């Protein structure tokens, strides 16, 4: 027997036994008593001879959601810039930049520099001081609510904004520092790095006044790592099992496997393999029947569970295994300890 329940991500959802629910924060307001708590944040910056300002109202539920998300994706900080759920609030800020550009007849270069000036205006705050962690990369919503951050936080925010505005962007990691690159035409002046056939010009979000292609002196000759902007689902799994119907020869074992997408973007064609391994019968052997449970696509922030019932021989060494795999994420393998019934 196989059972599947996935809790789908969405703005809001039904609740109750057997109904899909969501990890994603809801900003629905069914009544005034349920009105969300909002963070109101005002920002002021200047580009060339013009002073600009913007105001954002960000639900506390969204901030809390991102605070609870994993902050250990140190292999590619670009993932923090690509979450599906903060696009609505970034769009409000992006709308301000677009209106500003239209009002001043800004070129595309001006638009980039205006975003850069906005991010450079934010206070630099070390992670250790503000969070207690040596490294705490912030999601864009966190940086906007906190009103600043360190180099990777403001680089992530700038990359998220420019990416949504249609600019090709990458993150640029140098020793002890994070910046970003913006895709420009080949005749643009300044320092650039080639990546996948394109030139990405250096932007520093913590050094006020530096423009496109201007690298701080201490990083001029540093080796760099380019971090592409691509969503990367990251799946998590754990399981428990319950022994049922112990007979003289076999026992039935119900395995309950929890799955969740803690990365960015949608995990495609997820499947869980559930088996009772039989190490005494040889490497890779499993008691029949094992089970393949198809989940399908799992959205960012979605979580749920699958179940399968296995037949386990009595008095034989057994180990339960669950393997979660799919098209665009790294497989996750979890096993129990050895046991016999």
Predicted regions and their residues:
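Secretory targeting signatures
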Residues: 1-33, 180, 257, 267
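Short proline/glycine- and polar residue-rich coil/turn motifs
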Residues: 294-304
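Secondary-structure boundary elements
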Residues: 75-146
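Hydrophobic/aromatic-rich core segments of domains that either
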Residues: 153-232
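Short beta-strand elements of extracellular/lumenal beta-sandwich folds
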Residues: 249-266
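Terminal connector regions
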Residues: 286-291, 310-341
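Low-complexity, acidic Ser/Thr/Pro/Gly-rich terminal tails and inter-domain linkers that flank the onset
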Residues: 226-250, 341
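Short acidic, flexible loop segments centered on an aromatic residue
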Residues: 266-282
